[in-house]
Amino acid sequence: MALRAPALLPLLLLLLPLRAAGCPAACRCYSATVECGALRLRVVPLGIPPGTQTLFLQDNNIARLEPGALAPLAALRRLYLHNNSLRALEAGAFRAQPRLLELALTSNRLRGLRSGAFVGLAQLRVLYLAGNQLARLLDFTFLHLPRLQELHLQENSIELLEDQALAGLSSLALLDLSRNQLGTISREALQPLASLQVLRLTENPWRCDCALHWLGAWIKEGGQRLLTSRDRKIMCAEPPRLALQSLLDVSHSSLICIPPSVHVQPLELTANLGEDLRVACQASGYPQPLVTWRKVPQPREGRPRAQAQLEGGLLGLGGHSASDTGSGMLFLSNITLAHAGKYECEASNAGGAARVPFRLLVNASRQQPQQPAQPPPPAARPAGSEPRPEAGSMAFRALGVATQTAIAAAIALLALTALLLVAMICRRRRRRKKARGPPGEGALFVNDYLDGPCTFAQLEELRDERGHEMFVINRSKPLFAEGPAEAPADCGPEQGAGPGLRVPPPVAYEIHC
């Protein structure tokens, strides 16, 4: 046995992979095949031999095809990039591979496909795009693949297939759209597929309405040759009355649509320069309408047109909103005079279309719209009182000149009335005080008159400095005598009052002789 070992050595060497000159590290290279799978690569490795015809890059972490990464591989025939992390394909990513026949992009994270992603692949026969996150196929996505025979799009999230999405696929024989989110498909979308032999549409949430009249009739007339017995079971998901029924078992009279109805409120709005504006357009109907905004061209030429930006994208077929309504938001930012004019909200579905006009007026001044004053909490102000704008506030300045003048006049009149009331009250109080007099004003001072009998003819009327009347007897004696004085025995009645006696205020005058 030991003698035969040298003879087996050349055979063992032939079984080992031949490492070509310049083969990337950790990859295995054969004559025209390079295998770099499951190496946790983040980019396409450098040093791949230019003559490589089959390249395996599956089960890695490649998130982006760098520009020029595949440029040296002009002889490539088969490229396997499945089970990676690709999120997008740049336009012209495979332009340097004109001989490529098979391209596998299964199980990546592709969310969309650009129309120029497959430029240069005129010889491509098989394209695997299953297991990605594609939601829409836009018009002319596969326009540059005239010789494509198999297109695998199953297990995505495709909810909208535009009418010209498959344009250019005149050689396509197999189309797999199963296990997506398709609710409908138009006759125009399948018209370019003149060579189609196998069509797979199962496991989609089909909406059985008037838009699918053609599909049921087409399958019954001749399209069934493209469908296997399993693929013919196109099950309805809605409306609820037709759920779980096969499209082929539903009568045409049951496939109905409700034309859309559109509501925009308000129909006219005035905005200031520099503001942002949002206007909602709500639509109802069945199937869910597709809502779009557009600006109606102005009749005058040379006037700049504002571009309206749709917020939320197109709703309707596959839109993310309520089952019976569609809404689109017109969003205008930094409003200028060019934004003024007439806009139109249109809602359309298979049952028809409806439009509602909306007019935007632009205030040439840059004054910001005034917000109404916020009333204080009920506990913070008396019941029934309303907040009033202050003279210096923005709300007061927003009032008209006539209104401001009227408010100012009313305030001045109220102030004048208050001053008059205060003056009248003060004057009345002063009069009452004078009438009452100071302390001691009601006192009567009694003095002796010793020069003669007490007769009223001898009384002399005097007035003090305050104008009060006084009857004084014997003016030679001072008022307020220090000691008590006795009245003459022959004059006056007995009063028991001395010369300096103070009489209570109610007694006006009292004379003692």
From Swiss-Prot:
Residues 204-259 form the LRRCT domain. It is found in: Membrane. SUPFAM superfamilies: Immunoglobulin (SSF48726), L domain-like (SSF52058). It comes from Homo sapiens. It holds the Pfam family LRR_8. The chain crosses the membrane at residues 406-426. LRR repeats lie at residues 51-72, 75-96, 99-120, 123-144, 147-168, 171-192. The keyword Repressor does not apply. PROSITE patterns: IG_LIKE, LRR. Glycans are attached at residues 334, 363. Residues 260-361 form the Ig-like C2-type domain. This is Leucine-rich repeat-containing protein 24. InterPro entries: Cys-rich_flank_reg_C, Ig-like_dom, Ig-like_dom_sf, Ig-like_fold, Ig_sub, Ig_sub2, Leu-rich_rpt, Leu-rich_rpt_typical-subtyp.
